[in-house]
Amino acid sequence: MAHYLVIVESPAKVKTIKKFLGSNYTVAASQGHVRDLPKSQLGIDVENDYEPKYITIRGKGEILAALRKEAKKSDKVYLATDPDREGEAISWHLAAALKLDEKKMRRITFNEITKNAVKASLKAPRDIDMDLVDAQQARRELDRMVGYKISPLLWAKVKRGLSAGRVQSVALRIVADREAEIDAFIPEEYWSLDAQLKVKGEKRPLTAKFYGTEKKKMTIHSKEEMDEILKKLENEEFQVTDIKNSERTRKAPLPFTTSTLQQEAAKALNFGTQKTMRIAQQLYEGVDIKGNGTVGVITYLRTDSTRISEEADAAARSYIAETYGEAYVAEGTKAKSADKKIQDAHEAIRPTDITRTPAAIKDSLSRDQFRLYQLIWKRFTASRMQPAKYETTAVKIGAGEYCFTVSTARIAFDGFRSVYVEAEEEKEESNVLVGHLSMDSVLTKEEFDPKQHFTQPPAHYTEASLVKTMEELGIGRPSTYAPTISLILGRRYITKEGKNLYLTEIGEVVNNIMKQSFPSIVDVHFTANMEGLLDMVEEGKVPWKEVIRNFYPDLEEAVKIAEKELEEVKIEDEVTDVICEECGRNMVIKYGPHGKFLACPGFPECRNTKPYLEKIGVTCPKCGKEIHQQTIDQIIDRLMALEEKTRVQLLAPVIRGKKGEHVKVFEDARKQGYVRVRVDGEIHDLSEEFKLA
């Protein structure tokens, strides 16, 4: 019997896919990339037409040896990495590293990890798409060139540990520009005026809002203007001058793309972008469903397409007709996108089986998995449903030369809203008293309610709104939104307070240097155009090295000028009262990928470091020890350092402080029960994920 090897990226996929295939199939994981540019050097032969110098990633030797051994025993090797540029490149690197015979090597892809999808992919194998690979190679070299050439300059001129990046630096500038807008904002005064009007025969008054004159909307700019209007209204009669009844519809939303999922999960579930992607990855790769084993319950999570397969569309319409009735099924086919940036034939993010309702598998999912799956399921189901229909009434009420308005809207047919309502959807106005009004009705004024307001500055970016802006501007791609935001947070270029993102001092310094010395790198249009060029490489329209040839010389010249002309910027470390037990110096606060830590200023002579523990003046009621404040990432780092069998409980009510959301934890936590933390009022059980129980 012939033997086949299927290589995927992650061990989680191995478990899911194994059960779909027979005993003559071996499924193994590469565990991500196996080759990359070396970390210790540029890794690009500039003198040899920018040829990349790939090496085996440290720690991947044993994995490759095992795969090589298995490949030799197999009649055919199927490379089943993710269906995008990165996945295509991993397959290409695997083929090279394993020295696979082209005759026995085939590439397969699937948008969902289900039995039907995997079986179908095996019936339609193909060659590796070198246009996709070349687009990834171009992106990798561009990113390496920017990071490798500019980051050392930041170390020399500002401080070590800083970095620049082709996408991260533009994202930082977007946040910095918004901060500048907020700082420069000058509030302007304006006033609103509500009138409480009594309808004859009714006990409760209705609230009418000042509009202006019958034909022109007015803005009231000052108290003086308001006083003048109130004086004129003093003895005026309030009479209905116009009533308009109309119908309107609200279309169902499109199914999720990566960016819209990240945005809505942030609004509805309070998930950060990284958390959303981590949980979506779990749902895609497979979860244990009682009675069904490991099942991939959503389609591929990195996509900018709203397209839905004909099979999924038909299944959804059938389910909706059976569950909600034929009247709820949308007409025609929805969700084709004309966006030229769409990288491939991916579908939107959807459940792999619409009949697998959230309620049906709730007991098989963690709380976070359930909430995200429910969001995806509802959004997809709603996208195949009829619009919601509203009956609206708008009334104009005249008072002398002025006009007030009152309106109401009633849902006539709920349509898709029977399943899904967006987190920030506007509340429909509801004023039942409007139904008691008719033309020329006279109302009695009970009181006026004038209020002073001031225009508000632009809102600070949140993770959700930053993702939305990046997508709208063409900055980055579905796979890069979350890592980019995580990176500039980790570098402390921005901080997160509540949901809002704020520019830090070090972020401002780095952004100013980038704008001064590398204006094109942080230019939104330049970066968007570069993404467009990468798309053209993927489409086979532009050779990938042509993109590099047109980029690198200008970058190298800009670096040389900056090295000569850029002045050093000194940023002092914050000194603490904690004494270094090694040398007696006062330790300083440093920032790492997961937040603050204490370091000796005597580095490199003294390399002492320790965790940064913020005292909050609260003792543990069980053991009497002091409770400290730490970030989730700091906690996870410490959990990972424990022995595998350790059982830990972290009792963690949220503290909201200047530096973001933290949790209280017991310093002596390992003596407690199991791994559990509470963030934003939500309990997270980490024991499975970190294998500590």
What are the language-model segments listed below?
Residues 1-137, 211-214, 220-223, 227, ...:
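Intrinsically disordered, low-complexity regulatory segments
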Residues 2, 506, 522, 613-693:
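Conserved phosphate-binding elements of NTP-dependent enzyme cores
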Residues 2-5, 16, 25, 151, ...:
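Basic, low-complexity terminal or inter-domain segments flanking catalytic cores
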Residues 113, 117-195, 245-246:
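C-terminal or mid-to-C-terminal helical accessory/interaction module adjacent to the motor/catalytic core
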Residues 139-150, 167, 195-197, 248-260, ...:
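Core structural elements
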Residues 215-254, 441:
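Metal- or metallocofactor-binding catalytic centers and their adjacent structured scaffolds
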Residues 260-272, 467-477:
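Short helix-coil junctions and helix-kink-helix linkers
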Residues 277-281, 485-486, 666:
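Short, hydrophobic-biased segments on the C-terminal half of alpha helices
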